[in-house]
Amino acid sequence: METEVFHLSETNPDVRITAYLAGTYERIPHNEKRPAILIFPGGGYAYCSSREAEPIAHEFIAHGYNAFVFDYSVNGAAVYPTQLIEASLAMKFLRDNAEKLRIDPERIFTIGFSAGGHLAAMLGTMWHKNFIYDAIDMPYGYNKPTGMILCYPVITSGKYTHRGSFDTLLGDGKNDKKLLREVSLEYAVTKKTVPTFIWHTRADKTVPVINSILFAEALSKKNIPYELHIYPDGWHGMTLCREFLDAENEYIGDWVRCAEHWMKNTK
């Protein structure tokens, strides 16, 4: 496996992609061009969680993907829509460098955890917004993922919100009702939203499961393909459900197998 770091911002060195690339071997020719997964760690927009970064990359490398961890602006370094523009820039980077990175530019999925799930969902619902193309010179749809995986995502700024995520994302605009609705993603779903895989635990006390339910309901209303898994027990931030990360839970950890199957069948 090869790793390499690519910096995407001239003003913020913390905005970067860490690439995890499978080696190329004569007897494994498919490694020369793998599907890709772009990973958005959580952390309430205050930091990027290491538990939702490299371990996720290693997991998906083992399942046949080349993986890319995306560190975006956090902790007040920027406010919305900067993170969405950065995510679009990350997608552009992968497609611009698909040959070098040994990935299929038509098979790039995103995965986000908690607040990283919010960013992934913003990209998956708002990739077509004009302000993104005003900021980045690229063809229409160049930043559009093939599909998105949302793991215990922050979605709503309403009654069931994770308030801290929105406070940090919006900064001085945190009480602006128009902005709050704009980033409350159950309202952002349109016919242009990408196919979605979601998982959450019913017992999550940090980001209530209603976040995922509201998003799934919005997807249903627009007839967007999706798969939703709600596990009865467990807590926020279970990632891969492995003991070395937090706690072993084979049942919930099966989400990885389910997501892999979903990706293989998503066009």
Predicted regions and their residues:
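Short beta-strand/loop motif that positions the catalytic acidic residue
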Residues: 192, 198-200, 204
